[in-house]
Regions:
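Glycine-rich, N-terminal phosphate-binding loop of Rossmann-like dinucleotide-binding domains
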Residues: 1-3, 122-123
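Glycine-rich dinucleotide-binding loop and its adjacent helix/turn
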Residues: 2-59, 66, 83, 146-153
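Eukaryotic N-terminal targeting leaders
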Residues: 11-26, 75-91, 97-113, 141-144, ...
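Hydrophobic/aromatic beta-strand patches that form the interior of the parallel beta-sheet core
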Residues: 28, 45, 69-71, 119, ...
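Cofactor-binding loop segments of dinucleotide-utilizing enzymes, especially the Rossmann-like FAD-
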Residues: 49, 73, 168
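A Rossmann-like FAD-binding core segment of flavoenzymes
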Residues: 61-143, 187-243, 247-250, 254-255
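Glycine/threonine-rich phosphate-binding loop and adjacent beta-strand/alpha-helix elements that clamp
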Residues: 125-189
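C-terminal, flexible cofactor-proximal segment of oxidoreductases
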Residues: 164-310
Length: 310
């Protein structure tokens, strides 16, 4: 299964339901975002500053009415100490008022006339509407805990040996999915280099991972997703899938998981996704990479690397 995170995730806020009814079409999810030109001249509030949210509010600075408001729980580690030009940071929304006012955690507000569109870039929840719990004897996902049930290595199931999931984890996105896909294909075609461990060892892995979650406060399927880090957890995760898959055939059939090259590792460990203010530059200009723009110098765009999904 690869159709995992698809159900829209919009957090509950007091007054949101009434606000949506009063202003139909004003609140949308980033799933339906296609082009910044749709929002030309509009006053936009975006919510969320992970990959999609950041891309959206940065694109909107070229077309929307400025500033573009960006509501977030905290500053992203990808960002500098100040918002980029054209963006104004706001804390989380605490209430939508009946008169159309949007109230934030710090007590500030945006009136009904100050917002034309609100874009929730708040991600997706795992969704398995096709899963027949009665026929399969159990649920596939525990929504209270936030994990696959009876999972091994975020991919396999110790009680369902012919089922696998690709894409539930949060880590080195896309690259890790590719490792999973190759490992699953090898296993199900009988060409895996090493066997899966016995069910009891798979259960032990799940139990130990659960204890790790309790000890660290992290999510079960999160694998070192902070920028600049690709350490023990990531190497164990990808390394096992690599060993399980093994090499392709002598004649070249079968994909080999792409290696973590020195260039990739350097990119991850020195990542800067958005421009930061150069206090030494005239006028406090920004440097770095975004949309191909740069003020030049030693921090020119060519010296920066963009790696999404960490």
């Amino acid at each position: 299964m690869g159709t995992i995170r698809y159900h829209l995730c919009i957090p509950h806020v007091d007054g949101l339901d009434e606000y949506i009814k009063k202003y139909p079409g004003r609140v949308v999810h980033s799933k339906y975002y296609r082009s910044p030109t749709v929002y030309s001249g509009q006053k936009v509030l975006t919510i969320g500053n992970s990959a999609s949210g950041s891309d959206i509010f940065n694109e909107l600075t070229k077309t929307a009415h400025l500033p573009v408001y960006s509501s977030r729980r905290r500053k992203s580690p990808f960002e500098g100490d100040k918002p980029q030009p054209g963006v104004e940071w706001k804390p989380i929304i605490t209430r939508y008022h009946a008169d159309g006012t949007v109230e934030f955690e710090d007590g500030t507000t945006l009136g009904a006339g100050e917002v034309d569109k609100i874009i929730y870039a708040t991600g997706y929840r795992p969704s398995f509407p096709f899963w027949n719990e009665r026929a399969n004897g159990r649920p596939i996902y525990d929504y209270e805990v936030g994990k696959l049930v009876n999972t091994y290595w975020h991919t396999f199931f110790h009680d369902l040996p012919t089922l696998a999931v690709v894409g539930i984890e949060k880590g080195l996105t896309f690259r890790s999915f590719e490792y999973q896909a190759v490992a699953v294909a090898r296993l199900f075609s009988g060409r895996n280099a090493i066997p899966l461990p016995p069910a009891r060892e798979q259960r032990r892995w799940e139990e130990e991972r659960t204890e790790w979650v309790k000890a660290t406060g992290k999510k079960f399927h999160d694998i070192e997703s902070e920028p600049g880090r690709l350490g023990e957890d990531s190497f164990k995760w990808l390394g096992y899938l690599y060993r399980l898959a093994g090499l392709g055939t002598l004649t070249g059939d079968g994909r080999v998981p792409p290696v973590l090259s020195k260039e990739l590792l350097h990119a991850v460990r020195t990542i800067h996704k958005y421009p930061r203010y150069d206090e030494d530059a005239a006028g406090g200009e920004v440097y770095g990479y975004h949309g191909g723009s740069s003020t030049g110098g030693k921090h020119a765009a060519k010296d920066w690397v963009v790696v999404d999904g960490l």
